[in-house]
Amino acid sequence: MNAIEINSLSKEFGKIKAVENISLEVKEGEIFGFLGPNGAGKSTTMMILTTLLKPTSGKALVAGYDVVSQAKQVRQNIGYVQQEISVDEYLTGRENLILQARLNHIPKHLVKKRIDEILELIELTDKQNEPVITYSGGMRKRLDLAGGLLHQPKVLFLDEPTVGLDIQTRRKIWEYLRKIHDKFGMTIFLSTHYMEEADNLCDRIGIIDYGQIQVIDSPQTMKNALGNEVITFTISNNDEKKSNLISKIKEIEYVKDITTNGEGITVFSSKGTEVIPIIFQLSSSFGIKINSISLTQPTLDDVFISYTGRELRDETENFNKRREHAKMKRLRA
């Protein structure tokens, strides 16, 4: 059975098509990753699925309920944790969860047990009576996650759950997400800028760009489709010679795909060790000098670049700049 069903969904803002005729299904108990550059349509899609925005056309069901005609029932069956941490830093951890319990109309006789259970799961029992203002960023994010779990939703939506956190804290959050998934068996729909995060957590991922779904599959299947090996090399820029070289490389038997980024060229191949000597021969014939070359295994970053022509790294850097700017404004206030 499917926890989420999207059929021919579109959303337009005036003449802008933010989401264009997308369809996808997410199975019950699945962890599904939704990836895309800024402006690709992923945030708009998530807002529609969480009933914060109405679609222009098409249909979406979440937990068996229509997001437009049965919005109230959808909200009763989902948890939504936003990108920005939304806990009250002047309340204690426990007080924050009590507030969330009341907002979600959890029966009074269940509140204490639920809160104790969640605090133990995210390892905040010892800190529950301390003001959140004393918590680290990772602790605040864990508390934020806990607030989205108290009413035990069937589907948990996570918008960039670890953005802005250091790598050690991100990995700790991944551990908690796995614990949450294993304990409650809930469906998790997450958007993320971290390829490693999607690779580690998700059963399947969908890549959206320009409002359209580009591909949906498991991370491993996507990587396998690119080829067994990735050849990355740099050359001195000469647009005409470079274009001719790329055309010839595409004709090599074992080459599956090729992308470019400035002076860098990335070749996806089933037999990289056999393709590299041919690349050197072709470069020499065009009078092109190869400055550096490497042979690696394909990553989810490579998959993303293959489908969108862009990296997600810039998106994360933009978020960090916005966060730093907001921090400086608070200090000046």
Language-model features: locations:
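ABC transporter nucleotide-binding domain
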Residues: 175-270
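Conserved catalytic motifs of ABC-family nucleotide-binding domains
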Residues: 152
